[in-house]
């Protein structure tokens, strides 16, 4: 009788251990959490303030989609501010910027190279399409001439 009880106890113990092992092995949220934490979060406030010039870029990111607000207050130039909607690909925000300057509503394309600490505006040849200024070749923009906005 004791042998049967020992065998039954051993089976219960092994079954309990097997179930616990299966639970741990099938728990994938840990893997996805690690993967997501290595991606750069570009959401936040980027700011430049120097020599009477102020540029503020507020970015909200959802996957590859991005939106936010942008304000230019450059010394001795007209202030413009508005909102943008676009996408982030390979650390570059490419978006349509709708803004108001001197009471006139306009739209143009903007590009910023984003890092976890800064944003630099991209420059390149533009053309007007349907009343909106867009980059001729968004993949061939220069970022070395832009002002560096620091992430706050």
What are these regions (language model features)?
Residues 82-83, 92-94:
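N-terminal beta-strand/beta-hairpin edge segment
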Residues 59-87:
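N-terminal glycine/threonine-rich, aromatic-flanked beta-hairpin/loop signature
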Residues 17-20:
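Bacterial signal peptide processing site
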């Amino acid at each position: 009788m004791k042998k049967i009880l020992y065998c039954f106890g051993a089976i219960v113990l092994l079954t309990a251990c097997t179930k616990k092992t299966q639970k741990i092995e099938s728990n994938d949220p840990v893997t996805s959490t690690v993967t997501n934490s290595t991606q750069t979060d570009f959401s936040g406030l980027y700011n430049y303030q120097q020599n009477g010039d102020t540029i503020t870029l507020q970015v909200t990111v959802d996957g590859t989609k991005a939106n936010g607000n942008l304000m230019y207050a450059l010394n001795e130039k007209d202030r413009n501010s508005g909102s943008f909607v676009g996408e982030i690909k390979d650390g570059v925000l490419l978006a349509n910027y709708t803004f108001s300057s001197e009471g006139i509503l306009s739209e143009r394309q903007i590009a910023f190279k984003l890092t976890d600490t800064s944003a630099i505006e991209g420059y390149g040849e533009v053309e007007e399409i349907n009343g909106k200024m867009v980059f001729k070749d968004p993949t061939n923009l220069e970022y070395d001439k832009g002002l560096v906005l620091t992430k706050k």
